[in-house]
Amino acid sequence: MIYLHIGRHKTGTTSIQYFLRDNQDFLDNHNLIYVTDEKGLAFHEGPRILKNVVENDNKEIESIRKSFEKIVTKKNKDFIFSSESFQNSNPELVYHLFKDIGHEINIISYFREPISYFISSYKQRIQNTDLIFKFSDYINKQENLTKYIDFYENWIKYFPSFTARNFSRKNLKNSDLIYDFMKILLPKLEYQELPEKSEIANRSLSDFGLLFKLVFNNLLKLNMVSIKKPGQFYNYLPEMFTDHSFLDVKNFYLTKDNYERVISMSEQAFNFEKFFPECNFKLKISDLESNRNFRGEFIEITLDALNSLERKGFIEINKNILNSDLSKIFREYLQ
């Protein structure tokens, strides 16, 4: 058996990959082999090359197959391939990559409740870029984000064995993503048999953290600040403002119009339970609660945060930032 994990964005894929990489002995004891590319964390190289393959270019596909074909000849083993990049791959090309390999193939993929999925992906986009667009603009550019039925049907044309799981913690086995994933591979596995796990999380920004990053990106556009250590800066952002609730900006991006727009775009997600009953995505009333209240205190907090980031060497403040500049930017997102 080959388990092909399509790591849909914001569904704990990195945590799964680190666990698989760091527990080779455990996998070996259960006749499992985790296949990765040369970097050793996941199988990103395959989807990356497939992205540039024109139709069924056998030469390119064979070049990828050579990287793992000798490994999967072991008939008494099961194999795991994982990559976020499979989400954007052409299923037909992936089929040609694995066909006639001598193993049955089972697709594994996790799916999120639509509202949280849009929010989490928006936050990550703002965190990792210098973009300044509002949530409403992001929504309008992501029409396919929650078309779960199309995604599923495109893959089962070539891979009829498909396991879909609800990413919600209450739906996970023992409320544990790693255990939930491993139970798919090893149905008889008991929770206490699982090796100790490292906490690896691709954390999202808090709501004020998102607002701060939008303000920061505007300052970048105005050449008032510059980034000196991008990797460290982006990784540090989720750690900021964790001690503040900032209820004045709770879900500030989720206006009634935005909420209704996401709901209307996510019809397939809400009907996905017809295929997989456990994927019955329910909305919370709290999702509708949002605040867009500007306080002068936000400016002081932002200036303190900018100075702290400069002291750490992550950024440089190039020009004197006026309170009026910050106030104008804040109000752009809080109106």
Q: What positions do the PLM features span?
A:
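Anion-recognition interface
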Residues: 1-335
